[in-house]
């Protein structure tokens, strides 16, 4: 009798994706983050579902419903903090995953890469609307500041902002619709993940050398299933340590103050994972210019495959590109730090220089370095 996993229409799909999938024999731990992101998504949907059972999306009760979850619901505090810190783990894995893609040239798989950038945008949107839901000070003012950026769009801006708000300010209508968005987006993300995997399995995985591994592939199971389980255990350990020892380490104390439209917090800033983009937004003294820079700082990832000039796919054997890559990482860390600082000197000028360097590296320096390396190959 033929094996059911090779004949059954549904099981066959799973078999070809997770069991008999031919995988390069030399992929490193940097290839673990895809499965970790899948795990993060599952954790977020599960904890989010239980939170939604007790949360009320209404301005008068939202804040107290979150307090009620933490105080009165069985293990509600655990579910709430797993969900909050799960978002941080999600972004850590996302940024590692994107960094791996940039370093090893995974962006050469155009469709997979573009769906991945769409996924990044969807996760960022989900995190933003989710941050508004506890209805603390930073929730309210974050929503006000970020939605207000749309008013920079010529002609239709103000109308657009009022349409998104559902009124003339961030209020009950805004909170209700943001809850609806926050609930639906993870399912859209799940669908996109399936498309992401579909395109990936058309070509097979890349590997650290950037060379085709068709002649040296091994089955995904048991080799990479066990490797993914190890990665998952390490991530869960990190997440539980963070959640159980320092649950508020990455949060903002201002969000423990109920939202008050009459009182603006001293420093309005987003969660840590948006700080680099926030720093780029603030570094341009013009509203529309800042909004465009903010948008382009993420959308620039769509251009990466087109800016590819190197003859070698991976940066493994390209020291000049490696140097620029790590400068880019240092620059992003600098931007993250600047985003958390007040708008005053010397932070303003450092932020402007770091923002300029970010675009310069991706658009000019890295493609130029690749061309120089191509020349060196001919020596």
Swiss-Prot record:
Heme b b566 binds at residues 97, 196. GO terms for cellular component: mitochondrial inner membrane; respiratory chain complex III. It is found in: Mitochondrion inner membrane. It is a multi-pass membrane protein. Its cofactor is heme b. It comes from the Eukaryota. One of its GO terms (molecular function) is ubiquinol-cytochrome-c reductase activity. Signal peptide: none annotated. The chain crosses the membrane at residues 33-53, 77-98, 113-133, 178-198, 226-246, 288-308, 320-340, 347-367. SUPFAM superfamilies: a domain/subunit of cytochrome bc1 complex (Ubiquinol-cytochrome c reductase), Transmembrane di-heme cytochromes. A ubiquinone binds at residue 201. Keywords: Electron transport, Heme, Iron, Membrane, Metal-binding, Mitochondrion, Mitochondrion inner membrane, Respiratory chain, Transmembrane, Transmembrane helix, Transport, Ubiquinone. Disulfide bonds: none annotated. InterPro entries: Cyt_b/b6_C, Cyt_b/b6_C_sf, Cyt_b/b6_N, Cytb/b6-like_sf, Cytochrome_b, Cytochrome_b_C_euk/bac, Cytochrome_b_N_euk/bac, Di-haem_cyt_TM. Pfam families: Cytochrom_B_C, Cytochrome_B. Heme b b562 binds at residues 83, 182. One of its GO terms (biological process) is mitochondrial electron transport, ubiquinol to cytochrome c. Binds 2 heme b groups non-covalently. Component of the ubiquinol-cytochrome c reductase complex (complex III or cytochrome b-c1 complex) that is part of the mitochondrial respiratory chain. The b-c1 complex mediates electron transfer from ubiquinol to cytochrome c. Contributes to the generation of a proton gradient across the mitochondrial membrane that is then used for ATP synthesis. Belongs to the cytochrome b family. Heme 1 (or BL or b562) is low-potential and absorbs at about 562 nm, and heme 2 (or BH or b566) is high-potential and absorbs at about 566 nm. The cytochrome bc1 complex contains 11 subunits: 3 respiratory subunits (MT-CYB, CYC1 and UQCRFS1), 2 core proteins (UQCRC1 and UQCRC2) and 6 low-molecular weight proteins (UQCRH/QCR6, UQCRB/QCR7, UQCRQ/QCR8, UQCR10/QCR9, UQCR11/QCR10 and a cleavage product of UQCRFS1). This cytochrome bc1 complex then forms a dimer. This is Cytochrome b. The gene is MT-CYB.
